[in-house]
């Protein structure tokens, strides 16, 4: 949701990648903004830095400034709240509430993914649109059917659904997302040797009894690779990831320290899957072989 919000503010000309946003979460001009717990920021942060660090405060403010109608229109333009039309039974629309029903609390939280619900295929299609220069295509399962003698009896033809943002905005947002997988970002573990990766972490609280749980999460990472000339999108989600956050609990349970955040749970799995798919598709590397084999310990890296 933060990436779609970034697309919206850039496409509307409200901000650029280097525009600086005040990070005071008790700003009197905003209503109950979600804090960046456990993180110490400078007084301001650029939109680019907000993507890299996954700032709840900045995106809460950006969404609030866009307003509910405009924010919801971009979410809808990216295919949220709609059936994608993929050739699978039982597809769900997700939940994209009517913006007329959004109060200040809801529309300041929608940019961080609260109050809305999306399916994996919707999110994959939205990120593919960013990789496709802002063009949203209908996802599909079967690319072609070939007979034993080599005759092609069916070939899928790409179907354009819409153009939610301009190619230049899509490129700018993709470039910002590359920082997520680099040093200082929330998902260094998603880096694929030899390839640039543009991605975003997700750490979503699971609703429980009318509110959001502080113990149950969906941890995810979605990436577009190679970022310089996108070929694939991979989305990995862990539902209810087991986590043990302290050394004391770890020793008592006899298990290693785990973390429920997308940058630690899902990012490494993304890296493993993307590495195999890129080789299978024979996609040429776009970066020197610079990605290290070893990644930082949990307490040395920022994850959200």
For every predicted segment, state its role.
Residues 246-260:
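A solvent-exposed, charged loop/short amphipathic helix patch at secondary-structure junctions
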Residues 4-247, 262, 266, 295-297, ...:
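Beta-lactam-recognizing serine transpeptidase/beta-lactamase-like catalytic domain environment
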Residues 278-304:
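Gram-negative outer-membrane assembly/targeting C-terminal domains
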Residues 265-272, 276, 287:
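Flexible, small/polar- and glycine-enriched "cap/hinge" segments at structural transition points
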Residues 131, 181, 271-278, 282:
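Short amphipathic alpha-helical signal-transduction/dimerization elements
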